[in-house]
């Protein structure tokens, strides 16, 4: 079972560039919460997500918008790339797009080591082989797991030993294996989460607790073994209280214990004893971990991106869809009402085109450059963490991420409804240092009558949780339908020189419509930067077709290039690949944060002799480099 892992080396891996995450883990900060119940520094949230069946996870996105495009990173501390099976493989490393999106938002991602129950094809020999020492007394599989995580760029392993039939000697060897895994990985920032299954007898006996039978996999006499423990679903209020107390006695944090919350089949209708985990009064008892929150997509009959994000917003924010105004307490305790959100928007330049990482089309500068559906989380923007804080003295409009039009990527922020009073929509929580040259830019459009748009910049935080954000408002002008020509989009700019030397803590927009008219207004992009943008990023180097197969006028090919050098804006944010058509037009084929992309089923255009491809580097402000070209010849 472990032969392929034992023999793996990055030097011999032909798929390495396709599977390697490149975005470093961003630092996070915690703004003042928008409500009085969310707490900072207490319970945390882990999320165990199956993005696709084990063998069905694409390396770099796929041609469908029907995908669990998670965007509520602000509430998550750790994401487990859930999967593994006896028939498909029991070690599952996360794909690069998920890791890149998570890291951009400061979230760690763990791969999964799954030793399945015998009833699901498990074999105790696999467990024994996993924890076997070599002739020098080392654990070679532990060393390889660390090597894989470091090479592919993710953050550690979730270890789930559910194959029954072991004994205490096997349990001891498992604990020693975890220690070796930790010793090899900790210097590189890697983490271990242990699932509450195997106990110190070597048998599988889910405790629903941290207790004397399983604590040695978390903390033994020599110190820390695992960083966190995922406490099985069998927990009770009493066992969680006892678990937290034991963690305290061991000198560890009770918030390193994830109480399992099963949302796979019922989502927000799940029967959860919330007060046993995160009581409204008193300290949080432990943290919690969602099992399969992708229910927000899987339960839908309408699997469109818009329907998914509406459901996902309700799951994370609550029924009110406004974290500053939580709905009356019901059976579902939304994370936004429990855990303080976090952000990574702490440096210039910053830009967001409200791209969720999937879409029905691909847009560039307001024009469609591909009409094919797609997903790739590595292309996702850092989106506002609070969906959506809306302030108005009149009727509340609809505020959504919408996929019918976009400035760049696949989506935009849509505000629609009758504006009977000015409407403020909170956007990003930030820590942006402002200078005399700082400017804020909005790319926006209206499909209705004229509106006045102002941008809000808060140079201090609210005085307490639940208090309003104190914005300073800057006028950007008025716009009406068609004001920007063919695409309907226009760019508005406001100088931030009056705020120089201060820090921007939050950004917002305020929209006013004359006479309370119905409004359809889109925000396509938001950016804050210093000074004029005149220099493009450096182009990628040496693009090449590494392999190709041709059949019936189509080609399946592997494309690669060398990383562009760091330009004036630093390393590229990502790369984009286009097809150059015989008439000179361009069609978007895909993007990646890495330096390789698989292109399936590229059709021949007429009788062209070769398909020409362009690769461009894209920086943090979405400026694009000059193209680097390569071509694939068609057979006569």
Please give the residue ranges for each predicted region.
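Substrate-binding cleft of secreted/luminal carbohydrate-active enzymes
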Residues: 1-22, 257, 261-396
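Short carbohydrate-recognition loop motifs
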Residues: 395-424, 478-483, 583
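Beta-strand-rich modules
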Residues: 597-631
